[in-house]
């Protein structure tokens, strides 16, 4: 049975109290609140010193029927209540491996790093697969993550896991293997100039004929671009393709 303390290890436990400047935290929360108002994603902040949620947006995607205030008060108990038990174990392992990997970067680079993974949230008899991203917002003087921002959206995958670690500005990224319990560097996805354009126009509702006319290409060429984009992204439909391309900042 997973316990809240299982989520906190040496790499993400802050022992020395940070400087809790109320103005800094207030400005941070107001900034995140403003971002939450204009995005479809759910956002919350984790305080790793107090080991609690600092802020939770009111987007219902993450809340599982609770209010934002209730989820904030639940803190990490929310995971124990709304994540399937076998996936809780996955999150504990990921939490440990992910924060140890964060520690391999210097303090400047840590601010450029983010981790992305997929798991289910259950509410009653219903369950939904989400994409969960974590990135540092504030570090302690020792380089520990003090405040982390989490962004939640619907997953474009069909299964859990798919853990990726990205550093802004790097083409390559790292994937985590639960079988090998290690990180592996992978070559980043690269789309040809025409491929994201085909995806974008497809998402806008244009037919193959209309896209071909817009891009001054043959229909066979459009089919070729679309098929190759799907193959590179590892998807089978346009919804997944748009989601995966957006996540990988390919537009």
Where do the PLM segments sit?
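Alpha-helical protein-protein interaction scaffolds
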Residues: 215, 244-251
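Sensory/regulatory domains in signal-transduction proteins
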Residues: 46-69, 74-161
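Short alpha-helical "packing" element that flanks the helix-turn-helix/winged-helix DNA-binding module
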Residues: 195-202, 241
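Recognition helix of helix-turn-helix DNA-binding domains
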Residues: 205-240
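PAS-family sensory domain signal
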Residues: 20-76, 170-178
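Histidine/lysine/aspartate-rich catalytic loop segments that bind and position anionic ligands
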Residues: 155-175
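Short, low-complexity N-terminal regulatory "tails/caps" that precede and couple sensory modules
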Residues: 1-19
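Regulatory hinge/linker segments at domain boundaries
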Residues: 171-194
């Amino acid at each position: 049975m997973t316990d809240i303390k299982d989520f906190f290890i040496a790499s993400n436990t802050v022992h020395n109290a940070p400087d809790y400047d109320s103005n800094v935290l207030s400005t941070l929360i107001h900034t995140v609140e403003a971002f939450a108002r204009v995005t479809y994603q759910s956002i919350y902040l984790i305080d790793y010193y107090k080991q609690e949620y600092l802020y939770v947006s009111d987007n219902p995607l993450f809340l599982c029927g609770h209010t934002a205030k209730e989820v904030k008060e639940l803190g990490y108990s929310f995971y124990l209540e709304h994540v399937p038990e076998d996936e809780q174990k996955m999150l504990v392992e990921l939490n440990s491996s992910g924060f140890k990997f964060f520690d391999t970067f210097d303090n400047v680079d840590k601010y450029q790093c983010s981790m992305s993974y997929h798991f289910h949230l259950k509410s009653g008899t219903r369950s939904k697969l989400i994409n969960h991203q974590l990135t540092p917002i504030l570090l302690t003087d020792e380089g520990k993550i003090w405040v982390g921002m989490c962004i939640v959206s619907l997953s474009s995958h069909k299964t859990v896991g798919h853990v990726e670690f990205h550093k802004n500005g790097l083409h390559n990224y790292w994937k985590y293997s639960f079988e090998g319990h290690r990180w592996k560097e992978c070559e980043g996805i690269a789309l040809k100039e025409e491929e994201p354009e085909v995806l974008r126009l497809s998402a806008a509702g244009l037919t193959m004929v209309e896209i071909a006319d817009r891009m001054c290409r043959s229909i066979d060429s459009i089919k070729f671009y679309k098929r190759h984009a799907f193959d590179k992204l590892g998807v089978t439909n346009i919804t997944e393709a748009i989601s995966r391309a957006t996540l990988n900042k390919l537009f």
